[in-house]
Amino acid sequence: MWGYLIGAAAAGVSAVGYQSMAPTGQWFGRAFTGLRRPSKLLALTYDDGPNDPHTLRLLEVLARHDVHATFFLIGRYVKRRPDIAREVVKAGHVVGNHTFNHPLLIFQRAPQVRTELRACQSALADAVGEHCNLFRPPFGGRRPAVFRIARQMGLEPIMWNVTGYDWNAPSAEHIERKVARQLRGGDVILLHDGGHRAFGADRSHTGTASDRLISRYKSEGFQFSTITEMMGAGASHPPTAVGGKAD
C-alpha cells in the first residue's frame, strides 16, 4: 500500500514538473502553441534578442524572403540596443515580452514575476513606443501564477510546438533537420537570435537554417506569418500586435 502511494505521489510530482516546462502543456493555464486544425501557415519565432549583429543579419534573411516573424525580446538587451528593437518593428515584425533578465519563472515569487514583466514592458515601450501584448516565459517555465499575472497585465502567453534546439549554436544542418523532423502546418517554430547568458551570442547558424527552412517550405506551398496573424486565422479576436505588416 505504502509503495503504491509513494509511487503515485512520485508520478504526480513528475507530471507537475513536466507540465511546468513542456511547451505544449496546458495544466498551468492556456497558452497558444499553434493551430489545431490543418493549415498552410507556419510561424517563425525568435527568442533572446535583440543581439548584435545576428538579429540584424536575420532581418536581412527574412526581408529577402518577404517573411515576417515574431521576436520575444529580453528587456535588458532592449535597454542596451533599443535601435535594434526599433529595426525589428520597422521591418514589419512583431515583438513580445521575454522578461527583463530571463529568469526561470517557476522559482520566482509573484512580485518578482510582475517586476520582470513590467521592466521588459517598459523597455519595449521606451524603444518602440507601443504596448506589447505577447509574452513567452524564459525556458518555457511557468506555474499557474505566471500566466495569471501575465494576463492581468494584458499579456497573452505564447509557447511553441517545434524547436530547432539551436540554443547551443549547433550547425545549420542540425537546426534544419530538427525542425523538419517535427514540422506540420499550423506549427509555431522556436529559434533564437540571441543568448540569455550574454549579449553577442553567435547565432549565425540560426540565420542560415532560417534561410533554408523558408526556401524549403515556401516551395511546398506554406506561408509564414507572425503569431498575431496565425492567432487571427484561428480565432475571431486576435491580440493587437506591436509591429507587424500593415493591412
Which sequence ranges carry the predicted segments?
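Active-site beta->alpha N-cap acidic-glycine motif
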Residues: S20-I106, Q112, E116, A123, ...
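C-terminal domain-boundary segment and adjacent tail
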Residues: M21-P38, R64-D66, K79, A201-D247
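Charged helix-capping and loop-helix junction motifs
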Residues: R86, Q112-L117, A172-R177, R203-S210
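A short acidic, helix-capping loop that chelates divalent metal ions and anchors anionic groups
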Residues: P103-Q108, H196-G200
